[in-house]
């Protein structure tokens, strides 16, 4: 509502909104892992292996915030030439996606007027999806946007957690190859090599 001179009406409303209750939740998390192990064995060589995949999903206590991660990995250990050459190969990949949510919603929930509703069917708020806001008549001549948000007043915290995504993602790839060769006739003498790499 506005006064006759167009300024906002700051008198108390009729609602009893617990803004902090509107933006917080009981968080749920879950994790799933599957692995497969096996091997191939012949007279002069063998190759055990392991493959695994996993998924983690965690909700934050702030609505809209979450963390998701997918992982995959493998390991093979071939042993060749009557166990004179032993190789260890490892590979791991992970993809994570994080949304901290509308972080400034916490401050808005503390300062927002509790006598205002979360949403309103009033035409004043249609440009914000019906979320109640402190609004001012616009000075532009765009008939589709008759009101502006009052930047000097708190913003509706529920709109912040429901309409704003701040996703950050990361890919990480790790690899390692290790080889050990036991020289024939000089079994106490070994040649050893190790190569590792990371990409993110």
Residue ranges and their predicted role:
Residues 52-54, 166, 182-186, 194-196:
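Acidic/polar N-terminal loop/beta-strand segments that form early-domain functional surfaces
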Residues 1-37, 48-52, 56-66, 144-149:
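Surface-exposed beta-strand-turn/loop segments characteristic
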Residues 28-32, 66-70, 169-175:
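Residues that define the transmembrane beta-barrel architecture of outer-membrane proteins
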Residues 58, 71-73:
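Short helix/strand-bridging catalytic loops that position acidic/His residues to coordinate divalent metals
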Residues 34-40, 74-78, 175-181:
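Residues on the lipid-exposed face of transmembrane beta-strands in outer-membrane beta-barrel proteins
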Residues 29, 40-45, 81-83, 182-186:
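Outer-membrane beta-barrel channels and translocator barrels
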Residues 1-15, 43, 61-62, 75-174, ...:
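Surface-exposed loop/interface segments of Gram-negative outer-membrane beta-barrel transport/assembly proteins
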Residues 33, 46-52, 71, 84-90, ...:
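Membrane-spanning beta-strand positions in outer-membrane beta-barrel proteins
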